[in-house]
Amino acid sequence: MSRLVVVSNRIAIPDGSKSAGGLAVGILDALKNTSGLWFGWNGEISEISGEEEDDLNLMEDDGITYASVPLNQNDYDLYYCQFSNAVLWPALHYRIDLVDFQREAWDGYCRVNDMLAKRLQPLIKADDILWIHDYHLLPF
């Protein structure tokens, strides 16, 4: 059976502090059944950009590999707050009146997607099934 690789904006790293919700509930069994990989942002704002060699955090839990990277404040603001939330979310929910497009945010959105794709590439196997989740990763 092929391994499922889920790529999402943010991953639910198991730490025992709270129960999984949202996307995690729907995919944990599928990831477990395929010895899957869940890749994305770890939710941390860091001084490093996610592009450093040593900032990829890999851990295994209950048959699932979790691979995550941090974002720096600038990338978080541009990619997540200003483009994903202020452009894509309103546009994809029929609220064009709320869209606030700024070229710098688009550049940040593309830069973070490119960085994530480059960080994921060495972790991918030829027969993996990729699931790219949600609008945060459209250029992926």
Give short role names for the model-derived ranges:
Residues 1-75:
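N-terminal low-complexity, Ser/Thr- and acidic-residue-enriched intrinsically disordered segments
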Residues 130-140:
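An aromatic- and histidine-rich active-site surface loop
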Residues 18-23, 112, 135-136:
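Short, glycine/acidic-rich beta->alpha junctions
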Residues 40-43, 91, 133:
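Intrinsic disorder/low-complexity segments enriched in polar/charged and small flexible residues
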Residues 3-5, 128-131:
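Structural motif
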Residues 75-129:
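Conserved nucleotide-sugar donor-binding subdomain of glycosyltransferases
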